[in-house]
Amino acid sequence: TDTNVITHISIKPSKFFSFFKVLVVCRNDIQQVQQNRLKKFDWLWKVLVYGSYLDFIFIKRLKEFTSFKSVINNRKKFVHATGVTFSKNSAIYDVTHWKDRDFINTRAVECFHIDPDKVEKFQMERLGRNRTSMQDIFIAPMLLIRHGLDLEKLIVRSAISYKTAIFKKSLLSVKAYDFKDVDILKNISCFYSSNLMSYLAILTFSSVGIERENAKEFELLNIPYLRLSQDYYNKLESMHHSFLKKKKEPLHKEHDIATIQSEISKECKKINEEILQLINIDTIERDLIDYALNISLPMIRMNSVNNIMRKYKALRDSYIFSKIELGDQVLEEYAQVYIDYFARSFNRNEKRFIVEVHYSSQIIGMFFKVIDQDLFSKEIITVDTNTNLITLVTKLSTQHITDQLFVQKDIRGFEKDFFYIFKPNEKRLWHKAIAYLDVNEFDDAILKAGRNEI
């Protein structure tokens, strides 16, 4: 029924599985959702895999923006479809009249440019699908979009073709009939290369991080349409062409190549920042994007490694599973979330809310206390208690579900004058995005305890 509550458990890559063939589920990977939510928001199941209810709220807000699909649905201005199909068994359509036209290889399409070395002359005489009723998609100008995402950044690769050309169905074409509407295609191409695009791919694209890094047509079109303030596309297209030209020079200098790459990176940062400003992003939403890019994305890349030895190495060297060093900014940022939230309630009547960080190389604990104003020195105090915390390792155990499945437990609780949390020393567990979830859980517990006392 619609009111049925579903428990969703997400299994992620971990050192335990790679080294011991044991599945370990973290606390935040177990979530509950009412069934009617999954019916109403068909992308929510993907949020349950890589996100939380905070991501759901953020994405729901993004869905309220005008979509790219709604912009190009005006058939007088745009037409969109995928290209032709090569098929030996059902090649029934005569296309000899297309012979010697430009044929754009799918791999020619990269962010902001089409590699001219991967454009050749069309030589096929018959096809399995020739798009007879939609041949305008081959007439310039058109935005060509690859279904396969960039595996490094999980962004969508797209570029505008100013030349009429043939291409396969692995490319989606959005053709603008009026040249002035090319600006719309440029805006979309810029969005496709952004951090927000990567975030949406991880949190809403059904195949990404699950099966393979591919996007379906409806996913590529159901993204926010944002009008940028300047023509970033032309600048980046020019930079990429300069980069390709420079690389072809037999005696090119690596310094020149690096300079162009640096300029491309700077321009992309400008796009990212303007996009975030256009959606009026807040601090929590920025941290959710950061978590997706710096925790979930490396996890997805790691999962795509097929060679077993390379996977072991990827796990061993991965940032997300690496330990936090004493004094690392990660811990201070995590603790600051608690201070920003609870200090409003506790910093009164000559009292101050502080966080004591107890550090060891295996586990980390935080004690959240309210002290007298005259004892206050600073909000976050770090204590190196490497030897004292070792005894707590046994308490930071796992809940045995089956011989191959365990749930990794945190230690969290309340005492008379403070509350506390202990977790393993892994960077992914102490990210700011996780801090918001932990803070809300503590806040709910405090409110519940207060109601019970009434």
What are these model-derived regions, one by one?
Residues 28-181:
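Polyanion-binding catalytic cores of nucleic-acid enzymes and NTP/SAM-utilizing transferases
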Residues 16, 122-124, 225:
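Extended accessory and catalytic-adjacent subdomains in large enzymes
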Residues 62, 139, 164-168, 182, ...:
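Conserved structured core elements
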Residues 20-23, 27-28, 38-87, 100, ...:
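Non-catalytic DNA-recognition/assembly elements of restriction-modification systems
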Residues 2-38, 42, 213-216:
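A conserved structural/catalytic subdomain of Rossmann-like adenosyl-cofactor enzymes
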Residues 113-117, 149-167, 186, 190, ...:
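Short, ligand-facing micro-motifs at secondary-structure edges
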Residues 159, 170-171, 196-222, 255, ...:
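Glycine-anchored helix-breaking recognition loops at helix->coil/strand junctions
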